[in-house]
Amino acid sequence: MTAPIVVKIGGRALDEAASRGPLWNALASLAREHAGGVVIVHGGGAAVDAHLVRLGMFTARAEGLRITPPEQMDEVAAVLAGRVNTLLVGLLLAAGVNAVGLRLGDAGAARCDLHRRAGTDLGRVGEVIGGEGGAWRALLRAGCTPVLSSIGFDERGSALNVNADDAAAAVARILRAHALVLLTDVPGVRGQDGGTIVELDAARAESLIDAGVITGGMIPKARAAVATAEATGVPTVIASWDAPEHLRNLAHDAPVGTRFTAGARSAPRVSLASDGHG
C-alpha cells in the first residue's frame, strides 16, 4: 500500500474554517489523487482558549505546551474532539472527502502516556509512546480520510491532551508517511531572491540562518521542521493554507512550499508548538 500524506491543520485555518472552502476542496483533490490517501491531524488552541475563558478557567503554558489540570481535561476534550472535529469533518464531507472523525487514541492506533518533563507538572498533557495505526490503515484502505483530534488515552483509559504538532509527527512516524505537511501562514522559506526554497536539510537551513536569509519567526519554524524530519524519517513540508491550490501537487511529487529532509547534522531540537494546539 502506498504511504499516506499526513496534513496538520491549525491556527487561522481553523479559526476561519467556514471561509476556507478552497482549502477543503484542495484536500479533497489530494485525497483522491494520492494513491495512499490522506490523514488529517488538527489543533484548535484558539477554540479551547475561548471556551476556558467563558468558564472562568485560567490557561497556562510551559515551553509551548498547554498545561492541562485534571479539572480542565474534559473541557479540552469536548472542544477538540467534539466541536472542532465535528466542524472540520462536516466541512470536508461537504467538499467531497470521505472524512471520518476520530481521536488520536481511538482503537489503540496511538498509545499515549503522560508527558514527562523534568521540573514541570503539565497535568493531563500526553505524548505518543507507540502504536501501529491499524484503524487508520483500515480506513485508508476503505477510501476514507481519518480526521484526528489530538486527544489520546493512557493505559487506564483516561484522556490526555497531546500537542497537535507532536501528534501529527507521531502519526507520520507510525504510518511511515509519504510526507508530513504543516500548513501555516507562510508559503515556505524565502531565499535571497525572494523565491521559495524548494528543499532544505539541517546544515543548509542553519547556514541560511547564519547568513541572515532565514530570519524572525521562520527560524523556529525551519528548525522545528528539520527536527521533525529527523525524528520521524519523514520529509516535512511547510506550506501555506492561503495557497491551497498547490497542495494537490503533493500527489504528483511536484514541489509545494519548502520540503525539509533529514541531513547529516542535526538542527537544534525545538518543539513544534506555536500556540499549544494550533
Label each residue range with its predicted role.
Residues 1-278:
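C-terminal catalytic "cap/lid" subdomain
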